[in-house]
Amino acid sequence: MRVDAIAKVTGRARYTDDYVMAGMCYAKYVRSPIAHGYAVSINDEQARSLPGVLAIFTWEDVPDIPFATAGHAWTLDENKRDTADRALLTRHVRHHGDAVAIVVARDELTAEKAAQLVSIEWQELPVITTPEAALAEDAAPIHNGGNLLKQSTMSTGNVQQTIDAADYQVQGHYQTPVIQHCHMESVTSLAWMEDDSRITIVSSTQIPHIVRRVVGQALDIPWSCVRVIKPFVGGGFGNKQDVLEEPMAAFLTSKLGGIPVKVSLSREECFLATRTRHAFTIDGQMGVNRDGTLKGYSLDVLSNTGAYASHGHSIASAGGNKVAYLYPRCAYAYSSKTCYTNLPSAGAMRGYGAPQVVFAVESMLDDAATALGIDPVEIRLRNAAREGDANPLTGKRIYSAGLPECLEKGRKIFEWEKRRAECQNQQGNLRRGVGVACFSYTSNTWPVGVEIAGARLLMNQDGTINVQSGATEIGQGADTVFSQMVAETVGVPVSDVRVISTQDTDVTPFDPGAFASRQSYVAAPALRSAALLLKEKIIAHAAVMLHQSAMNLTLIKGHIVLVERPEEPLMSLKDLAMDAFYHPERGGQLSAESSIKTTTNPPAFGCTFVDLTVDIALCKVTINRILNVHDSGHILNPLLAEGQVHGGMGMGIGWALFEEMIIDAKSGVVRNPNLLDYKMPTMPDLPQLESAFVEINEPQSAYGHKSLGEPPIIPVAAAIRNAVKMATGVAINTLPLTPKRLYEEFHLAGLI
């Protein structure tokens, strides 16, 4: 059972919005109804006269300090730092919902009403919604310096020549949508001051230590003057890997004498003013020989980062790097540009660029297989990464690669050949199809980012162990896995290990946070090191108590035993702990601490199999069966792993078939910023989600494991697209596959 399960299901778990303090005030934004322009004048007299309003701040009142919001580890290399293009408030609004002012009042309703009473005169500017328009010669600059945020190129050599020399070439133009994370818990921050020099922030964040640094930068105060507390978090999926409302909450309390101020966003504001998934436009080419050997492929990517950089070009660049592991024995070229537009800012979201890139690669490879008459599973088996291969861009060796085994296992469980045979030569309105797609991903951000984790273990008087880790539990089950790691390494029952889930930057060891599927992989070395050190101290103390050599003793199930007679307990850990605490001379509280930097980053692999039915007349896709198979190394907790995979599959189905932020191409206004009009799949829309694992030990890992948090979403959309193509003969390269899009594509193909 998860270590946090009881607290959550009973309601005892405290989330940020559960924190209420005496004298707490509430802040609400005044936001732009236009996507691009200037606030010419502002009239807040009516709002200020409302009883209960404490203050109103505009762009003229906030520090003139641009800051970056992306949740990346800090770097000493100035050229690698995130783009600092944000201000707390702005006169130059760059997207629908940009913030120009903020109202602080004694209660939330008064703050909302006062914000609505603020009137602004606007000067509108041309609106740009696509990267193509942003790069036009006559495009209005959204930021000083132009609309091209950054571009990069990666290549293994003369890739075009290799593609042209292959027996068969395939090209494709692919488009993916802007979507929102839709985590259950909204974005909320609460800040106050307990003395004149320090600000305390409670926030729903994936990155407490990074929040501390960014707040310091945004307000130009020492980082040590900021304390960030992360309580329970109701999901993030990358949205909370940005520093969102914490700088504003800190600014407000500093201006209002240190009183507690809460900034809480509505669901509509989460759509408009937090982060989205980058929309990609991808032009791809691929060269394949008649026997199915992939000779080379190239991708040209345009990434839409919206109004502010946030994670910016990192998304497009990372997507190209992560997919390089998938089919590493071929030529590969990847070029990408990231552009500013007048859309809500895009940032990190589960998969970090990989779902978009894999959609293009796996669609092209499937089209090549169809044209060459090759089984889609066989063409992937022929080219799949194997142990001993290397990333063609970086030369990093692959020490564990279970992709072939994933395909073989999935093919057997899914009954691929039988189902595929049943889908041949179909006529009529209802048509079945099967599809498959693969992925590769990484286990952290190294070497692009510094990967560091810290852990502190302290023994209590009853022999139980408290664990403090900088790694952030945001609902993914990290604390449960950490307790297992410590329990196994020290030699105690899992029930005797308590992970302190609330991070506090004043107390908790340093760790950048929860992102990049890094938590268990990067935290494991620090936890293991601290656990081994604590075990060594325990045995050393036991040796003194028992007049034995430490070499003769070990710790099993919370008891000191002789190595040669492990079945005979000599002493309980509780008895040892009491002696260590209270003996008049020897011992002391037994504790251990470790901080370790990780310099390895193994790839994880996997695939999705899907069986679906297309109702051509209704333009509707129904998934009959879907299976994900993953190589994530040694599976530390099968139940948690299954939950991770099911969650990712559900999100992948949403991205493939349902979800899209509808943004007016002319005005930049978001038309569906709510959960009624933004169509997420609900339980009746989802089939039974199946998962399986291929456990291959990763030798670079502390416990033989690799990433699993993000990968399950990555191949789902491509597999669904490929199954729809098999069912109908129509290759649809734009997501999502909504009834409207299916109607348009089927009409063009002459099916309706």
Curated annotation (Swiss-Prot):
Binds 1 Mo-molybdopterin (Mo-MPT) cofactor per subunit. Pathway: Purine metabolism; hypoxanthine degradation; urate from hypoxanthine: step 1/2; Purine metabolism; hypoxanthine degradation; urate from hypoxanthine: step 2/2. Keywords: Metal-binding, Molybdenum, NAD, Oxidoreductase, Purine metabolism, Purine salvage. GO terms for cellular component: cytoplasm; xanthine dehydrogenase complex. It is an enzyme of class 1 (oxidoreductase). Heterotrimer of XdhA, XdhB and XdhC. NCBIfam families: PRK09970.1 (NF007426), XdhA_XDHase (NF043082). Belongs to the xanthine dehydrogenase family. This is Putative xanthine dehydrogenase molybdenum-binding subunit XdhA. It comes from Escherichia coli (strain K12). The gene is xdhA.
